[in-house]
Amino acid sequence: MAYKILRIYSIPYIHVYSNFLDEQESKNLSYCELQKEFLKKKISYSDVLSRNMKKLGNQSYEIIENFDYLQKKWAQENMSSKFDNLNNNEILQNQIVEIKPDIIFFQNLPTINL
């Protein structure tokens, strides 16, 4: 039986986010496109879990909870209410509701407070 898995993780060396965004400055990418470009860099855990889960016939999603810009981008595209005042935990809660995973795998999350 196939299932839907969501992995939520953070990357401890957050300077990689600003370096990545500097490279993407001229591109107007959607959340999915931006996430895909970031995951191509294979930084930290990357999307290794999702790639392998998909090979097994499962749906798999990745959320980098401490990548503030990416989280705000998701909120901007997916939430009708004011997203500017939401913190990452509130955005994350909305992402979980939207994805409706069967399994949530939390990995390396020192900042999460649900």
Q: What are these regions, as identified by a protein language model?
A:
Residues 1-65:
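N-terminal subdomain of nucleotide-sugar transferases
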Residues 10-13, 42-55, 64-114:
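Extended catalytic core of nucleotide-activated donor transferases of GT-like folds
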